[in-house]
């Protein structure tokens, strides 16, 4: 027997049973719910629904315990093996979206420069798709690895990402709409910062005033992840300093 599994699973079962009783759920409604769960599995949207409703809670718990930068959900579109880039992510030749410069420094939780830290950067195409996932877009586009220099500094150029909808024709989208919500995520950029001996930092940053920033369907937007509008030389700028914490030994 696994005591932790017993503890968490029992609490979940108790909470569901309490809700069924308090809401006086009918047998017809119960059967509809069972059917919905079967459709969710058939549509391969279990992870989508869990991300939309619960992932932000897990991230908030992690944020309370970290000494580093605020984490955020990874999402389903991270791919290992992105190319190391020098200066810019690869984008469509006809990408007319506003240029974006992302720059800053990576430091350890004791304030030292995190020289050689590797930063995975990935974001949507101008039409809200992800390379390597949608429409056979080559995996080396709109994603790449940036290596911090001896002072922990990094910089990369790309273009502005776009808001997009999570799958909205399947069970998850149907449920969100029945609840009076929507299926839109605001434009954002994902980051995963890694360095030997340190805990990986997975996070994402948003744009002040952007569509859906105040009503993200996945509830992933925290105030300190929203970047103010700043432009230089015709490009929008995100100044982001990351703090990574030393990996903790598990006894």
UniProtKB/Swiss-Prot annotation:
Keywords: Aromatic hydrocarbons catabolism, Dioxygenase, Iron, Metal-binding, Oxidoreductase, Plasmid
GO molecular function: catechol 1,2-dioxygenase activity; ferric iron binding
SUPFAM superfamilies membership: Aromatic compound dioxygenase
A GO BP annotation: catabolic process
Root EC class: oxidoreductase
Acetylation recorded as keyword: no
The reaction(s) this protein catalyses: 3-chlorocatechol + O2 = (2E,4Z)-2-chloromuconate + 2 H(+); 3,4-dichlorocatechol + O2 = (2Z,4Z)-2,3-dichloromuconate + 2 H(+); 3,5-dichlorocatechol + O2 = (2E,4E)-2,4-dichloromuconate + 2 H(+); 3,6-dichlorocatechol + O2 = (2E,4E)-2,5-dichloromuconate + H(+)
Pathway per the UniProt entry: Xenobiotic degradation
Cofactor binding notes: Binds 1 Fe(3+) ion per subunit.
Known cofactor(s): Fe(3+)
Pfam families: Dioxygenase_C (PF00775), Dioxygenase_N (PF04444)
InterPro entries for this protein: Catechol_dOase_N (IPR007535), Chlorcchol_dOase (IPR012817), Intradiol_dOase_C (IPR000627), Intradiol_dOase_core (IPR015889), Intradiol_RC_Dioxygenase (IPR050770)
Residues bound to Fe cation: 130, 164, 188, 190
E.C. number: 1.13.11.-
Domain of life where this protein originates: Bacteria
Role, per record: Chlorocatechol 1,2-dioxygenase involved in the degradation of chlorinated benzenes, that occurs via chlorocatechol intermediates. Displays broad substrate specificity. Preferentially cleaves 3-chlorocatechol and 3,4-dichlorocatechol, and shows lower activity on 3,5-dichlorocatechol, 3,6-dichlorocatechol and 3,4,6-trichlorocatechol in vitro. Is not able to convert 3,4,5-trichlorocatechol and 3,4,5,6-tetrachlorocatechol.
Homology family: Belongs to the intradiol ring-cleavage dioxygenase family.
Protein name as it appears in the record: Chlorocatechol 1,2-dioxygenase
Organism for this UniProt entry: Pseudomonas sp. (strain P51)
